[in-house]
């Protein structure tokens, strides 16, 4: 949907903008935005942390719905009629068939944001609660640890 380019160099951000415009020329809905590196980094953390919190919230609602014999899928289908809620990250279990969030980005990014909050004297209560729920209730097996140290590459990706 969007590409965020973080750079202090106008030449570099223009070059990247041109490259991405060539790559995504057939996709009119990809928006390219330029900003500072710190803003771009924070956008990534904010996006992933928000989605991680949303996954934790969905899992909590799922548990409650199950307990009171409500149909979680119907509740979410009807709740999503409110466009402010968005339509992604409501599936319980998730696309990997598991509860909570894993993968290579959500656990890393939510923890980076938690630590950055603390480093700046801010209590990250909501982020900590989502992380604690993920660790203790939804995904205590911590399967994301298996992904540490892996290389990012297109080789052998078939």
How should each PLM-predicted stretch be described?
Residues 1-88, 116-123:
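Internal alpha-helical scaffold of NAD(P)-dependent oxidoreductase catalytic cores
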């Amino acid at each position: 949907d969007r590409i965020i380019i973080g750079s202090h160099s106008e030449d570099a951000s223009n070059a990247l903008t041109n490259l991405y415009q060539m790559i995504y020329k057939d996709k009119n809905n990809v928006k390219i935005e330029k900003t500072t590196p710190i803003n771009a980094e924070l956008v990534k953390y904010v996006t992933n942390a928000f989605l991680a919190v949303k996954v934790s919230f969905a899992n909590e609602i799922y548990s409650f719905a199950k307990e009171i014999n409500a149909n979680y899928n119907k509740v979410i289908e009807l709740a999503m009629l409110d466009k402010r809620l968005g339509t992604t990250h409501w599936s319980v279990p998730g696309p990997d068939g598991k509860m909570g969030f894993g993968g290579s980005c959500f656990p890393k990014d939510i923890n980076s944001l938690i630590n950055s909050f603390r480093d700046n004297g801010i209590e990250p209560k909501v982020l900590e609660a989502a992380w604690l729920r993920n660790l203790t209730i939804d995904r205590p097996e911590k399967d994301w640890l298996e992904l540490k140290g892996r290389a990012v590459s297109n080789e052998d990706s078939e």
